Amino acid sequence: MSSQLEALRRHTTVVADTGDFEAMRALRPTDATTNPSLILKAVQKEAYRPLLQQVVRDHRGAPLAELTDRLLVAFGREILNIVPGRVSTEVDARLSFDTRATVERGRGLIALYEAAGIPRERVLIKTASTWEGIQAARLLQADGIRCNLTLLFSLPQAVACADAGVQLISPFVGRIYDWYKKAAGADWVEAERAGANDPGVQSVTEIYRYYKRHGITTEIMGASFRNKGQILALAGCDLLTISPELLAELDGAQGDVPVRLTRDDEAGEVPARRPADEVWFRTELNANAMATEKLAEGIRLFSADAIKLDALLGGAAGR
């Protein structure tokens, strides 16, 4: 009998959610995703310190923003030597409300990849699913730069991403689960909110059905998992990005993985497709306390780690 990881691969593209490219080798993901927090965690390991030092040594006089982007691309290049597919590299979260700056940084990241001989088709530029981030992705996509919209917690965000024609979205599962569990307090019963009843799983399922029912080609990559059950409950999703720890857990477990999401699923009603204008987007997002709070929190956390990464690079450069 095959492992659950192998069984999952039959239905879903498996992606590694880490900056630790050495951890990817044994688990053979197709793609990989990174973010500022994952890169910060990786460069604090002794094994990756030479990569940081080389970037600083080769570009010592460069501004911190450029050093950061060069470090991200250095990690991305190493990852692409391991995975056969794509890597997602994130624009600085501090630019989440600045469309123009996000576009400029996204173009800059792609230019660095292409200068290193990496075709743009192997790179996804990650931006936050704010209104500004989504509009930046619209412009980048028009330039032939494929985008991954992250920090996505609600159907209105997904609708706006589809309207912008983005390549891929990353709806979060675990952070939605965290919010509802905290809100429920002592009333939360884990067994009753597992599997298809998990609020994070339900959110991704809602988005998946909306996209497939309306023939939307934007890829859906479930992200931010807290346990193996959440992953198995989304088998059949286009892609799932999974931490090395949970990948290893799936690899060590034997058994079949039934398909939970299918393109021809007719279960349940879905809203009519609509264009996403700014007033509608902000109104709908504001009405969803969970999505509003988790989006803001995610930007704060990624921004804080970007500041720490700046400090680490600045220290290495003697500034």
Swiss-Prot record:
<dbReference type="InterPro" id="IPR013785">
    <property type="entry name" value="Aldolase_TIM"/>
</dbReference>
<dbReference type="InterPro" id="IPR001585">
    <property type="entry name" value="TAL/FSA"/>
</dbReference>
<keyword id="KW-0704">Schiff base</keyword>
<comment type="function">
    <text>Transaldolase is important for the balance of metabolites in the pentose-phosphate pathway.</text>
</comment>
<comment type="similarity">
    <text>Belongs to the transaldolase family. Type 1 subfamily.</text>
</comment>
<protein>
    <recommendedName>
        <fullName>Transaldolase</fullName>
        <ecNumber>2.2.1.2</ecNumber>
    </recommendedName>
</protein>
<keyword id="KW-0570">Pentose shunt</keyword>
<dbReference type="GO" id="GO:0005737">
    <property type="term" value="C:cytoplasm"/>
</dbReference>
<keyword id="KW-0808">Transferase</keyword>
<dbReference type="Pfam" id="PF00923">
    <property type="entry name" value="TAL_FSA"/>
</dbReference>
<dbReference type="InterPro" id="IPR004730">
    <property type="entry name" value="Transaldolase_1"/>
</dbReference>
<keyword id="KW-0963">Cytoplasm</keyword>
<comment type="subunit">
    <text>Homodimer.</text>
</comment>
<dbReference type="GO" id="GO:0005975">
    <property type="term" value="P:carbohydrate metabolic process"/>
</dbReference>
<dbReference type="GO" id="GO:0006098">
    <property type="term" value="P:pentose-phosphate shunt"/>
</dbReference>
<feature type="active site" description="Schiff-base intermediate with substrate">
    <location>
        <position position="126"/>
    </location>
</feature>
<dbReference type="InterPro" id="IPR018225">
    <property type="entry name" value="Transaldolase_AS"/>
</dbReference>
<comment type="pathway">
    <text>Carbohydrate degradation; pentose phosphate pathway; D-glyceraldehyde 3-phosphate and beta-D-fructose 6-phosphate from D-ribose 5-phosphate and D-xylulose 5-phosphate (non-oxidative stage): step 2/3.</text>
</comment>
<dbReference type="GO" id="GO:0004801">
    <property type="term" value="F:transaldolase activity"/>
</dbReference>
